[in-house]
């Protein structure tokens, strides 16, 4: 039986939160970044493509559009590691399964034509069918994230840390550093901005995101201080997903960058995670920067491949870069 795919673009006001979030929850490509309360914080005017076969929704794709003058691009927002296409659970023979994926993706790609000048998304690791994008001259590039499984004992997890990590933890303990958890993200957001890791817009986006996540009880902040709580050594923002804790962001006070505070904080997050129901791993989110990638590996984490899919107009990419550096308003 052939599919009759009808793909419709819906604005944010046309999307029902309960239906959307239930679809994302049930999708094999599930990730918290695609939930409506997350997208509302990081890109309030998001839209989505809905792929129907009759009355059944086969797939959805959240779209985060930005524009400058008459040019448009679709890119992942700040604080969002992955997005992409989210399918409903598909049953049946394997050849039929791939036929459905191909047909739906062709319909989505047809809809994207003419709607944007640049496309750049990281797709969730569980999305593994990229061929239709290659056929349409998109580039598909493998990236790495790192997951630290926490299903073994704490002593076994600790034994797999590199010597540098264990030395950092010992150093922090000798200084009698303390772990503080509180609800405010302001201290971390301000430190990130002071170190020029993020700009003002990303600061506001992070604060808005934390308000939404706090309402859903799916986040926590961790700060490392001295025993008098007079100095903040570092801070971290963590998102609680179905089976993972996502290491969303961290920053270190430059005065204490050799204190071992970050490794000490991560070790405390691991201990906290082991006492949380359903949590199976820490998601470090990954980085293609050599020094950061090396640090994540030092905790004994495993590499997880995901794919960046993009189509670029090089002239417009340069224009976007100039706009970002000049702090031009991009809506």
Give the label of every model feature segment:
Residues 2, 65-66, 126, 134-156, ...:
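Active-site/acyl-donor-binding loops of N-acyltransferases
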Residues 44-46, 114-118, 277-279:
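Short, high-confidence coil segments that cap the C-terminus of an alpha-helix
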Residues 54, 106, 218-321:
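Aromatic (often tryptophan-rich) hydrophobic motifs at membrane interfaces
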Residues 66-84:
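Conserved acyl-donor/pantetheine-binding loop and adjacent beta-alpha core of acyl/acetyltransferases
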Residues 80-95, 151-152, 250-259:
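A short, internal acetyl-CoA/4′-phosphopantetheine-binding micro-motif in the GNAT/acyltransferase core
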Residues 96, 100-104, 202-205, 265:
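Soluble or luminal CAZymes and related metallo-dependent hydrolases
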Residues 99-142:
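Non-catalytic accessory segments adjacent to catalytic cores
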């Amino acid at each position: 039986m052939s599919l009759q795919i009808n793909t419709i673009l819906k604005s944010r006001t046309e999307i029902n939160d309960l239906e959307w979030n239930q679809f994302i929850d049930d999708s094999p490509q599930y990730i918290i970044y695609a939930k409506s309360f997350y997208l509302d914080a990081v890109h309030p005017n998001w839209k989505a493509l809905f792929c129907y076969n009759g009355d059944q929704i086969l797939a959805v794709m959240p779209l985060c559009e930005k524009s400058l003058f008459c040019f448009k691009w679709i890119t992942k927002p700040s604080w969002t590691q992955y997005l992409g296409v989210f399918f409903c659970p598909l049953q049946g023979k394997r050849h039929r399964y791939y036929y459905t994926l191909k047909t739906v993706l062709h319909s989505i790609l047809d809809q994207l034509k003419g709607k944007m000048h640049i496309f750049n998304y990281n797709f969730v690791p569980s999305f593994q069918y990229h061929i239709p994008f290659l056929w349409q001259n998109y580039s598909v590039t493998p990236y790495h994230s790192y997951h630290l499984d926490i299903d073994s004992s704490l002593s076994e997890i600790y034994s797999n840390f590199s010597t540098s990590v264990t030395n950092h933890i010992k150093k922090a303990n000798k200084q009698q550093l303390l772990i503080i958890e509180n609800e405010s993200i302001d201290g971390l957001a301000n430190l990130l901005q002071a170190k020029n890791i993020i700009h003002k817009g990303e600061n506001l986006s992070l604060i808005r995101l934390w308000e939404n996540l706090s309402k859903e009880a799916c986040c926590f902040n961790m700060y490392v201080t001295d025993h008098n709580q007079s100095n903040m050594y570092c801070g971290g923002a963590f998102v609680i997903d179905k089976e993972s804790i996502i290491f969303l962001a961290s920053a270190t006070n430059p005065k204490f960058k050799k204190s071992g505070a970050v490794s000490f904080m991560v070790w405390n997050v691991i201990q906290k995670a082991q006492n949380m129901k359903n949590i199976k791993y820490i998601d470090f989110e990954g980085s293609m920067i050599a020094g950061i990638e090396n640090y994540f590996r030092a905790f004994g984490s495993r590499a997880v491949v995901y794919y960046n899919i993009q189509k670029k107009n090089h002239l417009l990419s340069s224009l976007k870069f100039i706009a970002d550096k000049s702090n031009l308003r991009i809506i």
